[in-house]
């Protein structure tokens, strides 16, 4: 089975009803696709991993079940091991060392997309087009802001990719800007 975006979206929406979790999957997908283009990798595969990485979270929101349940579902449905491993690698508590660029990238963009979303939503415009890397860095210093986001994962992710943190943040912002409307971050909610 070589899953495509349509199959990945079907899986995501089968298990996920929360609009914010679906948008998170879309944001991670956009960042993964952008990095796949940058690294001349398989954009479809990387995008699929980004889109489904949290597909089981709504039904399994605890660290002892999330990802483990998802991996089992993917195996039962015959999904390829590289995609399964990519999904599993994003959860640092599973103690899976990212073994390739795709796995390093999912780890690097997962928390960051959520943080960028939070930064956009507190802006008066609620528009990701108005978010700059400098404003994200400033908010990262405020531990009370989006406290559930692991800032260590964000900085470690950039290091694992061998990318300057500001460049990484800017790159992911640009990827998200490309689908701002789908993410509800185009200012229409302001």
Question: Which role fits each region the language model picked out?
Answer:
Residues 3, 7, 23-27, 65, ...:
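Conserved active-site and cofactor/substrate-binding residues in soluble primary-metabolism enzymes
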